Amino acid sequence: MQIIEKYFKHLSPEQVKQFGALHSLYTEWNEKINVVSRKDIDQLYERHVLHSLGIAKVMAFKPGTRILDVGTGGGFPGIPLSILFPESDFHLIDSIGKKIKVVEEVSAGAGIKNIRTTHGRAEDVTDRYHFVVSRAVTRFKPFWGWVAKKFSDEQFNDLNNGILYLKGGDLDEEIQELNRPAYEYDLNMFFEEEFFDTKKVVHVPAF
């Protein structure tokens, strides 16, 4: 938890409480349904929570922003972002029902009010969003195909509506394959831990 407060110094008491609740909630649910690798559970705050919040260092969502988290797994990046941005609306979707069960239990246990969940596929979602977030669920080109028609044309954030994608390594080939403008932000510009040396946020504008 200290690592979150190290990089996000203006958390409200409620946010501190919610972030603080995540370790025990994930530890409990991970024993029933494995959503975080066993070796990572002790590094939950660095490798999952803070990693998710890397998106917040690139884009601070304004109140009323609608965000879709595709392939959320156990709730990353959606749950940490929903705590940090309580006035934005988050829709977390995954095709595996037991993972959505964990998301629902963790968000309820932490008292998070601005999340809704769907057990299903991104292609079947009919709503419109300002941003789609995800954490390395597939290559950019197929991912774009899943979400290209999900974007609202209502623009009011500092970045253009689009994808904010957490990925690592050399992405040149994937971005070339995507054949759309894409902007890379190295997370080691914001976080000093070695884990983030090769981690990035990629912004793919929708329009």
Swiss-Prot record:
GO terms for cellular component: cytosol
Annotated NCBIfam families: rsmG_gidB (TIGR00138)
Recorded family membership: Belongs to the methyltransferase superfamily. RNA methyltransferase RsmG family.
Annotated binding of S-adenosyl-L-methionine, by residue: 71, 76, 122-123, 135
Gene3D superfamilies: Vaccinia Virus protein VP39
Keywords: Cytoplasm, Methyltransferase, rRNA processing, S-adenosyl-L-methionine, Transferase
Gene name in the database record: rsmG
EC assignment: 2.1.1.-
First-tier enzyme category under EC: transferase
Subcellular location: Cytoplasm
Protein name: Ribosomal RNA small subunit methyltransferase G
Primary localization class, coarse: cytoplasm
Transmembrane segments: none
Molecular function as annotated in GO: rRNA (guanine-N7-)-methyltransferase activity
The species this protein was found in: Cytophaga hutchinsonii (strain ATCC 33406 / DSM 1761 / CIP 103989 / NBRC 15051 / NCIMB 9469 / D465)
Function: Specifically methylates the N7 position of a guanine in 16S rRNA.
UniProt keyword Plastid present: no
